[in-house]
């Protein structure tokens, strides 16, 4: 605990209560009389790692969505409900990662099969 209340690392993007470091994830104010447990509960919102059950639900939703894309020739409009389920089951950062990973895996699959066609700008250079 810092001299004026809970001390949290600025390198992690959070606040030192008395000095005014802030994070947009805080749900309330942190003053000199804020108990450490209260201040930490503000920080913990949205920060906890998913449990094993939550990870399994996320991966299952991702797999169902990817399967739908495969079955519908990448037509995302046919998989809107599964996309919504995927987005509500996984942390946003994971969704970005999984989307990029799928793009890479599809590119790699085409490249290894000799089906990769460079864009016109790449072919001209």
From Swiss-Prot:
It is found in: Mitochondrion intermembrane space. GO terms for biological process: mitochondrial ATP synthesis coupled electron transport; mitochondrial cytochrome c oxidase assembly; respiratory chain complex IV assembly. Its main location: mitochondrion. The keyword Transcription does not apply. A motif (Cx9C motif) lies at residues 58-68. Disulfide bonds join 58-90, 68-79. InterPro entries: COA6 (IPR042289), COX6B-like (IPR048280), CX6/COA6-like_sf (IPR036549). CDD domains: Cyt_c_Oxidase_VIb. Residues 55-98 form the CHCH domain. One of its GO terms (cellular component) is mitochondrion. It is linked to Mitochondrial complex IV deficiency, nuclear type 13: An autosomal recessive, infantile disorder with a fatal course in the first weeks of life, characterized by hypertrophic cardiomyopathy, left ventricular non-compaction, lactic acidosis, metabolic hypotonia, and mitochondrial complex IV deficiency. PANTHER family: CYTOCHROME C OXIDASE ASSEMBLY FACTOR 6 HOMOLOG (PTHR46690:SF1). This is Cytochrome c oxidase assembly factor 6 homolog.
